């Protein structure tokens, strides 16, 4: 047992809470998959190392310890003085290794929200979170009082403010805001949908094939609109701080991202899964077989995504690295920049011309030529070609049947929101009803003001300190393609730099391009 992770509500600040959550995340991280931290693979964890304790106190006098299972980041038990209490569904080994020397009791409910809410006679929406709620939870559990209803309610507070906050950047951020402003809050529909879909999102990322999830994950926006997440490059994936371990991607042993060796019995994701999806790209248009013509050599174009899923915009991502519509292959005519991309019979085409890798960053590359799929024309119906990879916006793609832009506000330094002002962009107090703070995130990696989706966030130059402004999307430049990363940065692939609030001073009214430092003025969050 290394040092106990501690948090006290006495004199707590958003900073002290942030440090607590970061320490907890660090202790729970077992590796990286697709560059996202993941809990340890249960097959690699010995039972005696399966649990960690977190000490929560609200003063010198009152503290409790919470036992957390490292394989799912879940609260399984707590200790109050010389007594310890275990949730009904706690693993058998929990009572062996957690809180030795205490008198152990079993609680009458398990750790699922359904059961906790039934015993609490309240739903999560009705239970306030924040410092006051946590202070009370610690006092109540420490008192050893036998009121089951109140026990369940206080555990709902602790689970969300510790476990859920460790799993999601947006939940830890929300708690941080409530500490900073001294106000309690109830979980909104977006937060609840994230809590309910943690295993689905984790599985989607780990089982993704060529960027596509095996199943859609349906989240909710704050105003109860469905948010469909069906691809690794969907910007919402960046709110994950920690994933549940589901399985290792089949090619993980070649992946430099995995920091632990694969053991024999470790679960490998199925490689049999071959998703059929749309491929959205420039200006949200879809990869389309021109005029439904499947004769060899017919060109592939960018066309507006149809209201219904239709065959000539549907592509099966095969495990042999071909991408097929109606059984025929997406094929490059040659290996020189500017060669056009066509539909072709898979068996008679040159094999290397039909192979494509879809990278996590939205690049679709033909390995033989090292050229990438590109929509050079901004007009509908333009022929797709292969070009030298420059991470241009017109070379950005996202797979999935839901190719419509994802509309969100973007909060950053000091919990202020990104706001469009003419051709400029800066930070202002967040206001859900302000159109100037709504951003449409397109499949091509562009970030567009909802007020005018012909305008894209663009870095003026390719150099450190360059201001970020709104410019015409019709350019399709590299300076208009952005990646939302799990470290909180909004990243320019071409420049290898990130969006940065100049000088950590919002009053300068400038967001600039700057090398990544990880400081708070480079950390952003989609609030959908």
From Swiss-Prot:
The modification Pyrrolidone carboxylic acid is found at residue 1. 2-beta repeats lie at residues 453-492. InterPro entries: Ribosome-inact_prot_sf (IPR036041), Ribosome_inactivat_1/2 (IPR017989), Ribosome_inactivat_prot (IPR001574), Ribosome_inactivat_prot_CS (IPR017988), Ribosome_inactivat_prot_sub1 (IPR016138), Ribosome_inactivat_prot_sub2 (IPR016139), Ricin_B-like_lectins (IPR035992), Ricin_B_lectin (IPR000772). Gene3D superfamilies: 2.80.10.50, Ricin (A subunit), domain 1 (3.40.420.10), Ricin (A Subunit), domain 2 (4.10.470.10). 1-beta repeats lie at residues 326-366. Pfam families: Ricin_B_lectin, RIP. It is an enzyme of class 3 (hydrolase). Glycans are attached at residues 200, 361, 401. Disulfide bonds join 247-269, 286-305, 329-346, 417-430, 456-473. 2-alpha repeats lie at residues 414-449. The keyword Hydrolase applies. 1-gamma repeats lie at residues 369-401. It comes from the Eukaryota. 2-gamma repeats lie at residues 495-528. Residues 273-400, 403-527 form the Ricin B-type lectin domain. One of its GO terms (molecular function) is rRNA N-glycosylase activity. The active site is at 164. PANTHER family: PTHR33453, RIBOSOME-INACTIVATING PROTEIN. The A chain is responsible for inhibiting protein synthesis through the catalytic inactivation of 60S ribosomal subunits by removing adenine from position 4,324 of 28S rRNA. The B chain is composed of two domains, each domain consists of 3 homologous subdomains (alpha, beta, gamma). In the N-terminal section; belongs to the ribosome-inactivating protein family. Type 2 RIP subfamily. This is Abrin-d. It comes from Abrus precatorius (Indian licorice).
């Amino acid at each position: 047992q290394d040092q106990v992770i501690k948090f006290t509500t006495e004199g707590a600040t958003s900073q002290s809470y942030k440090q607590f959550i970061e320490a907890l995340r660090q202790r729970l991280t077992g590796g990286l998959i697709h560059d996202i931290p993941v809990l340890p693979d249960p097959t690699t964890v010995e039972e005696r190392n399966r649990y960690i304790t977190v000490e929560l106190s609200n003063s010198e006098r009152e503290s409790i310890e919470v036992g957390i299972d490292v394989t799912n980041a879940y609260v399984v038990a707590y200790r109050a003085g010389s007594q310890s209490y275990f949730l009904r569904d706690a693993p058998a080994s929990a009572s062996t290794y957690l809180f030795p020397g205490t008198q152990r009791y079993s609680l009458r409910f398990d750790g699922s929200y359904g059961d906790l809410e039934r015993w609490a006679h309240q739903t999560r929406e009705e239970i306030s979170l924040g410092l006051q709620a946590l202070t009370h939870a610690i006092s109540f559990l420490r008192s050893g009082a036998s009121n089951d209803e109140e026990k369940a309610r206080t555990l709902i507070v602790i689970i969300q403010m510790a476990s859920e906050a460790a799993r999601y950047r947006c939940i830890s951020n929300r708690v941080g805001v409530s500490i900073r402003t001294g106000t309690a809050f109830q979980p909104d529909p977006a937060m609840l949908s994230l809590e309910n879909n943690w295993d689905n999102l984790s599985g989607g990322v780990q089982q993704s094939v060529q960027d596509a999830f095996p199943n859609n994950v349906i989240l909710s926006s704050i105003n109860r609109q469905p948010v469909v997440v069906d691809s690794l490059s969907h910007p919402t994936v960046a709110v994950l701080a920690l994933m549940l371990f589901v399985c290792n991607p089949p090619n993980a042993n070649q992946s430099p991202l995995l920091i632990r060796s694969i053991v024999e019995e470790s679960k490998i994701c199925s490689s049999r899964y071959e998703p059929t999806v749309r491929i959205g790209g420039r200006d949200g248009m879809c990869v389309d077989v021109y005029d439904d013509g499947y004769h060899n050599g017919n060109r592939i174009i960018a066309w507006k995504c149809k209201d219904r899923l239709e065959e000539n915009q549907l592509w099966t991502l095969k495990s042999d690295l071909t991408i097929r519509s109606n059984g025929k292959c997406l094929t490059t005519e040659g290996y020189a920049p500017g060669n056009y991309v066509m539909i072709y019979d898979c068996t008679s085409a040159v094999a290397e011309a039909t192979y494509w890798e879809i990278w996590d960053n939205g690049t679709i590359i033909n390995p033989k030529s090292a050229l990438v799929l590109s929509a050079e024309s901004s007009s509908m119906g333009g022929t797709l070609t292969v070009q030298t990879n420059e991470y241009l916006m017109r070379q950005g793609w996202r797979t999935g049947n839901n190719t419509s832009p994802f509309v969100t506000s973007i909060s950053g330094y000091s919990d202020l929101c990104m706001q469009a002002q003419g051709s400029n962009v800066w930070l202002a107090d967040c206001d859900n009803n302000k159109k100037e703070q709504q951003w449409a995130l397109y499949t091509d990696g562009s970030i567009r003001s909802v007020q005018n989706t012909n305008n894209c966030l663009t870095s003026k130059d390719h150099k450190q300190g360059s201001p970020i402004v709104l410019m015409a999307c019709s350019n399709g430049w590299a300076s208009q393609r952005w990646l939302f990363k799990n470290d909180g940065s909004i990243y320019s692939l071409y420049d290898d730099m990130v969006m940065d609030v100049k000088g950590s001073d919002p009053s300068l009214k400038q967001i600039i391009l700057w090398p990544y430092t990880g400081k708070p003025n480079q950390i952003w969050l989609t609030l959908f």
